[in-house]
Regions:
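Non-catalytic, C-terminal membrane-associated alpha-helical segments of glycosyltransferases
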Residues: 351, 366-478
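A short, conserved alpha-helix in the catalytic core of glycosyltransferases
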Residues: 249, 257-276, 280-308, 313-315
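Short, flexible, basic/aromatic active-site loop/helix in glycosyltransferases
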Residues: 231-256
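Conserved donor NDP-sugar-binding/catalytic core segment of glycosyltransferases
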Residues: 175, 190-230
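Short, acidic, metal-binding catalytic loop of nucleotide-sugar glycosyltransferases
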Residues: 55-64
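Glycine-rich, basic loop-to-helix element that forms the pyrophosphate-binding segment
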Residues: 105-132, 154-175
Length: 496
């Protein structure tokens, strides 16, 4: 059994005409395995990153069972620019290599909710899917959608038994574990990413959630994260220094507290058992909450450094239009569509997302803590006022407002925190102490930050220090000044 779909003759001919293998140039042949993976890509309409992501999925050395592209954009929520996602799907070439379904979930409240809604729509449509190389859409055909028909074909037919089987929740008849491969629109996996993830879960049957090593979108030699640890207060401790070169120094990691949702592979049964991610974490810390829930349910969370994914981190860097940042122009290799008007690229600025990230951290802190919610909320308010004052002293008024605003927002989220606690408790089969050994102490984070600041100061000193050539020139000038001064003194003595 092929890991993904049965390779169609039409797709093979299309690939042969391009002079490449089904997985892309230079990629190894797909393996045979009983494990099935369904790739799920969530996007807010057409973004500058979507095409590269879809191309990367199409070039996997092991193909997914099918690809679901979930579009959460609509006129009502203000997301997207109106460009049909089907155009990018067709332009990326992914629909010529594997089965693609475009579904829409404009009412989704976050990444996890979008995945849940998209899977539900996919299951409903699995009985009337599109057979053939082109991507199918859940929108009805007609004059209103004539523009979209340029990138899609509308032949309707039965989905293969394999695709329909993966759309359902039962996998007993298939004799293997079903997996969901979660992808953001700004997360482009390396050709062997899915293969490495599947190899990891095949070797570690107790692992239910595995994630790849994340590297920079434009400079993949720079590390972003290799799994994450946090304090008990959900404060992240990333051991990777900004700009750190990937030399395999973190490739010995395995069990971690958290893997991000970008590129994560999760057991479909576990995803359904947990009802996906918590709705209280729509954008940030959804991976942390999901990882904790998986751990408490008695499963392992593992990072797979051999699986690599490029991540733009558009939400973190404030590059989403909803965050006040203009969308970036696509990269030179992205071949933007004429119908996609890209604004002038905005400078990445994590401060744009600070308030949302702080709200997520405080919510996660209260959700995972066993302390009384009322006391925690009062402490958050005091902490917010204090941190806001510090921000003002350091001349960061925008961050000061964000600190206080986040504390006031969480102060009104007592009900959401209770629901989050009940959610974790309802699925817990092991003691919370299993997470304790994966925590990092706040003192360790402060120590690491002091070391980083010291290293930055040393780098700044070295950068400002003169080079050897400049030192030699300065020595020559000093020698000339001494000789000149000596000559002047001798002349004065002689005249005197």
């Amino acid at each position: 059994r092929h890991l993904g779909r049965p390779v169609r003759a039409g797709a093979s001919q299309a690939q042969a005409s391009r002079g490449m293998s089904p997985a892309g140039p230079g990629a190894p042949a797909a393996r045979t395995t009983g494990t099935e993976a369904l790739a799920v890509v969530v996007t807010a309409g057409v973004t500058p990153y979507l095409r590269r992501t879809l191309r990367s999925v199409a070039r996997q050395s092991v193909e997914p069972e099918a690809v679901i592209v979930i579009d959460v954009a609509s006129r009502h929520n203000g997301l997207g620019d109106g460009t049909p996602v089907e155009e990018v799907v067709a332009a990326s070439g992914i629909d010529a290599r594997m089965r693609v379904r475009v579904v829409r979930a404009p009412d989704a409240r976050g990444f996890g909710d979008a995945v849940a809604r998209g899977l539900a729509l996919y299951s409903e449509l699995s009985g009337t899917g599109t057979r053939g190389p082109r991507a199918s859409s859940d929108r009805p055909s007609g004059a209103a959608n004539s523009k979209r028909s340029r990138g899609t074909t509308r032949r309707r037919g039965r989905v293969t038994d394999r695709e329909g089987g993966n759309a359902g929740s039962s996998r007993a008849s298939r004799g293997g574990r079903g997996w969901l491969w979660l992808l953001h629109d700004d997360a482009a996996p390396a050709p062997g990413c899915l293969e490495a993830l599947l190899a990891a879960v095949a070797e570690a049957r107790s692992a239910a959630l595995v994630g790849p090593k994340q590297v920079d979108w434009d400079e993949p030699e720079h590390l972003l994260e290799v799994g994450l640890r946090t304090t008990a207060s959900a404060r992240r401790a990333n051991d990777v220094v900004a700009g750190e070169i990937d030399q395999g120094q973190h490739d010995d990691r395995s069990d971690v507290l958290e893997v991000g949702t970008a590129g994560a592979l999760i057991d479909r049964a576990v995803w359904e058992e947990l009802d996906g991610t918590s709705p209280e974490f729509p954008v940030f810390n959804d991976g942390l909450e999901l990882s904790r829930a998986v751990r408490l349910a008695g499963h392992r969370v593992v990072v797979v450094p051999q699986a690599v994914i490029r991540h733009r981190r558009a939400s973190y860097l404030g590059l989403r239009p909803s965050q006040g940042g203009a969308p970036e122009r696509p990269a030179a290799d992205a071949d933007p569509l004429p119908s996609a008007p890209w604004a002038r690229a905005a400078d990445p600025d994590p401060d744009r997302s600070f308030r949302a990230r702080r709200i997520a951290q405080l919510t996660a802190w209260a959700t995972f803590s066993g302390r009384p919610i009322g006391l925690l909320l009062i402490w958050f308010l005091i902490l917010g006022i204090a941190r806001s004052g510090v921000r003002l002293l350091t001349k960061s008024p925008a961050l000061a407002r964000a600190e206080l605003g986040a504390a006031l927002t969480v102060l009104r989220r007592g009900g959401a925190i209770r629901r989050g606690r009940r959610r974790l408790a309802s699925h817990a089969t092991v003691r919370r102490s299993v997470l304790t050994r994966l925590y990092v102490h706040a003192a360790d984070i402060r120590s690491v930050r002091r070391d980083r600041r010291r290293q930055e100061r040393e780098r700044a000193v070295r950068a400002a220090a003169p080079s050897e050539l400049e030192l030699r020139e300065l020595a020559v000038l000093a020698r000339r000044r001494r000789l000149s001064l000596t000559g002047v003194l001798l002349a004065v003595v002689v005249v005197a």
